[in-house]
Curated annotation (Swiss-Prot):
Catalytic residue positions: 593
Protein name: ATP-dependent zinc metalloprotease FTSH 10, mitochondrial
The keyword Metal-binding is assigned to this record: yes
Function text: Probable ATP-dependent zinc metallopeptidase. Involved in the assembly and/or stability of the complexes I and V of the mitochondrial oxidative phosphorylation system.
Main location group: mitochondrion
Boundaries of the annotated transit peptide in chain numbering: 1-86
EC number(s) given by UniProt: 3.4.24.-
Organism of provenance: Arabidopsis thaliana (Mouse-ear cress)
Length: 813
């Protein structure tokens, strides 16, 4: 692993190759005259060029001195990168010459490339100091690894032989071969021996293991060593041994005490500290790339911990090919008109200033998810000829205290520098929540500080004109009141789910990108009638799913059948035909869905049925019935009562025709309970409760009515649901045979449409005087629109009481 890191680090740049394979005259890397600071890149390379060549030759001489052969080295260092490092051959250049021979293909040359090459050389010369420091940073770890390897070899092949004191006394001291002794660090006695006894006789010459190390300033060679317990006992034993063999005290073996520093032991002692420092340095470098500062799309690279206070701003690219314009946004014409006024003011401010008008400081885009708030902001960026800065509300929040306000200041500072400009803050509720909620400190303090800084920047002493702030959220109810006041967000632009005309326009935009077998208008009219309550994101998902289904079935074009399957996929979930269901359960599901279909068919105010199926979908639905509701802004008591009866049709069919009830009606009962509680406690339909309204609040622990009133509401809801279920059971018993026929058809076909129900049940006894969404789905609605415009009489618009348009009703089992 060390060799791999070593080879990859040394082969990182072309400049390091010369450093590795340098030699000759330039290998004098320790020349003091060359340790001056380099003036340019060439000087820097020449200064470090011969360093590893010197190490390579030193290693080769070391191997030769130890008697190592090339085969031993190749077996020891089988790593190809290490062999390439110690090779004297220059490696191949990393360019296209390795793939295309020079004679067969030549790279094109032109003046532009030569100019860029000259420019790059100039930049290299200008940044010679940085390159020089980078070279040494890259070489630091490999040099340390080489030093560790060399020290391991030198330690592993120790020349000296360890002996005991008795062997020293009998073989060396008595033979007169001891020249002198060095005691290192009061622990090890190093014995330096002569080649012949002191009496110059060569009869008993002791041969040591290999060549010894010559002593400095004395005779003898260092060949043996032994450990001593203490200095006093060693001196006593040595003196007694010399007296025993009759050595004169003047001829005693000289003993020298030396203090030596073993560098690798010191390195091991400081290894934990060095490891901690290296970890801190590595963490600091990682933080430079991962914390704060400008980054991401449109930001600057190389952000560091010291730039953490800078906002992560995304600037709109004026030259982008995928720009979005206002013509690409549909279904929200009123909101689009409001936003376009900001763009027109920034482009032509004099027109408004002459009239004495001031541009609003900001606009808050409010609406359910998927309605196109961010898409409208992208269109603003594409249409406006002024700088557009976008950021997410969560980008202001960080683990460090004070980062949020600093990023707010940095954001507005950059916006003022390029004024007139537009700032878009997506999901502003991340920092704009009302202050003081819960009374807790901690993370709320940092968020409130960020909010306070945003309030000051939008409308404070240092506020300057020319900066417009747009923000998007789907939770305007939790925003701080100071943020919503005029002077900061002057306008609140509500973007609701599109109506049938808006869905038609949105479908036409997305259908233009799909290969169809008819014109886009043919599908857009029918699909708009089929998808009430769908937002723009849902419509885009339906179109994409239809294209995917067509590709899955190897279709040349996308047809209406593919769109039907896509809508079923979006509403009901993934189709699961392979789910194991028993015959009894399948029969129960069929009668349950048949009860829904028959009950809705014979109820005047029930929504027309589109289709019913017993194919399992999603995670829990064993079947469902799909209706095409009309987008009524107002609902009457009779309409809600009929819808309650229709929802209870499945449970009534199980009881009447099968004779037992199942858990399949759990979702139906949940809808009925919620609907009935709304009629009694919210809409004021109950005579017992009176004209009171208790809408559901977030605080469920306290209720705005007494326990007695709550008991009355519960009793009234139970009574209303009982009446609805009794009426539904009577209806199912009256049409028992037809319910059974439809159930058997479902078991046979699995999917029934309205035409199949008409054959069994006949025409629906109730016909609406107005065009329904189902009629628009069958034949389009352009002609009916023209007729209604001729006969229409202007009336005062009725104010909506907060009743949302009805979505497609899916009744899972």
């Amino acid at each position: 692993m060390i060799f791999s890191k070593l080879g990859s680090s040394l082969a990182r740049s072309s400049r390091s190759k010369g450093f590795v394979y340098g030699g000759g005259v330039r290998s004098a890397v320790f020349n003091q005259g060359r340790l001056r600071a380099p003036q340019n890149l060439e000087a820097a390379v020449n200064q470090v060029d011969g360093g590893l060549g010197f190490l390579r030759r030193h290693f080769a001489s070391f191997a030769a001195r130890k008697g190592l052969e090339a085969g031993d080295l190749s077996r020891a260092f089988a790593n190809p990168r290490l062999r390439r490092f110690f090779s004297s051959q220059t490696p191949k250049k990393k360019n296209y010459e390795n793939y295309y021979p020079k004679d067969s293909k030549k790279a094109p040359k032109n003046e532009q490339k030569s100019e860029s090459r000259d420019g790059s050389k100039k930049n290299e010369n200008e940044n010679a100091g940085d390159a020089f420091s980078n070279e040494y940073q890259n070489m630091l770890i490999p040099l340390m690894a080489i030093a560790l390897i060399l020290s391991t070899f030198s330690l592993g092949s120790r020349e000296q032989q360890q002996i005991s004191f008795q062997e020293f006394k009998n073989k060396l001291l008595e033979a007169g071969l001891v020249d002198h002794i060095d005691v290192s660090n009061k622990e090890v006695a190093k014995v330096y021996v002569r080649s012949s006894p002191k009496s110059q006789t060569t009869e008993e010459v002791v041969q040591g293991p290999g060549n010894g190390v010559p002593a400095k300033g004395r005779g003898g060679q260092y060949k043996y060593y032994f450990n001593i317990g203490s200095v006093e006992s060693f001196e006593e034993k040595l003196e007694e041994a010399q007296e025993a063999i009759g050595v004169n005290s003047h001829d005693f073996v000289p003993v020298t005490y030396v203090s030596e520093t073993i560098w690798y032991q010191e390195l091991l002692r400081f290894a934990p500290t060095l490891l901690l420092v290296a970890t801190l340095i590595f963490g600091a470098r990682r933080m430079q790339g991962g914390l704060g500062g400008l980054g991401g799309p449109g930001g600057k690279a190389g952000r560091g911990i010291f730039n953490i206070g800078k906002a992560q701003i995304t600037r709109a690219d004026k030259n982008s090919k995928n720009k979005i314009y206002f013509k690409d946004v549909a279904g929200c014409e009123e909101a689009k008109q409001e936003i376009m006024e900001f763009v027109h003011f920034l482009q032509n401010p004099k027109k408004y200033e002459d009239l004495g008008a001031k541009i609003p400081k900001g606009a808050l885009l409010v609406g359910p998810p998927g309605t196109g708030k961010t898409l409208l902001a992208k269109a603003t960026a594409g249409e406006s000829a002024v700088p557009f800065l976008s950021i997410s509300g969560s980008d202001f929040m960080e683990m460090f205290v004070g980062v949020g306000p600093s990023r707010v200041r940095n954001l507005f500072q950059e916006a003022r520098q390029c004024a007139p400009s537009i700032i878009f803050i997506d999901e502003i509720d991340a920092i704009g929540r009302a202050r003081g909620r819960g009374g807790f400190s901690g993370g709320n303090d940092e968020r409130e500080s960020t909010l306070n800084q945003l309030l000051v920047e939008m409308d404070g002493f240092g506020t300057t004109a020319g900066v417009v702030v747009l923000a998007g959220t789907n939770r305007p109810d939790i925003l701080d009141k100071a943020l919503l006041r005029p002077g900061r967000f002057d306008r609140q632009i509500t973007i609701d789910k599109p109506d049938i005309k808006g869905r038609d326009q949105i479908f036409q935009i997305y259908l233009k990108k799909i290969k169809l077998d008819h014109e886009p208008s043919y599908y857009s009219q029918r699909l708009a009638a089929l998808t009430p309550g769908f937002a723009g994101a849902d419509i885009a998902n339906v179109c994409n799913e239809a294209a995917l289904i067509a590709a899955r079935h190897e279709g040349a074009t996308v047809t209406m059948a593919h769109f039907d399957s896509a809508i079923d996929r979006v509403i009901g979930g993934l189709e699961k035909k392979n789910r194991v269901i028993s015959k009894l359960e399948r029969r129960t599901v069929a009668y349950h869905e048949s009860g829904h279909a028959v009950a809705g068919w014979f109820l005047e105010h029930a929504e027309p049925l589109l289709k019913v199926t017993i194919v399992p979908r999603g995670t829990a639905a064993l079947g469902f019935a799909q209706y095409v509701p009309n987008e009524n802004l107002l609902m009457t008591k009779e309409q809600l009562f009929d819808m309650t009866c229709m929802t209870l049709g499945g449970r009534a069919a199980e009881q009447v025709l099968i004779g037992r009830i199942s858990t399949g009606a759990q979702n139906d009962l949940e809808k009925v309970t919620k609907m009935t509680y709304a009629q009694v406690a919210v809409y004021g339909f109950s005579d017992k409760i009176g004209l009171l309204s208790f809408p559901q609040r977030e605080d469920e622990f306290s209720k705005p009515y007494s326990n007695r009133t709550g008991a009355m509401i519960d009793e009234e809801v139970r009574e209303w649901v009982g009446k609805a279920y009794k009426r539904t059971v009577e209806l199912i018993e009256e049409h028992k045979e037809q319910v059974a026929q439809i159930a058997e058809l479902l078991l046979e076909k699995e999917v029934l449409h309205q035409d199949d129900l008409t054959k069994v049940l006949g025409e629906r006894p109730f016909k609406s005087g107005e065009t329904t969404n189902y009629d628009r789905f069958k034949s389009g609605f352009e002609e009916s629109e023209k007729e209604s415009q001729k006969e229409s009489v202007p009336v005062k618009p009725v104010e909506d009481d907060g009743i949302p348009p009805l979505e497609p009703q899916v009744v899972p089992t």
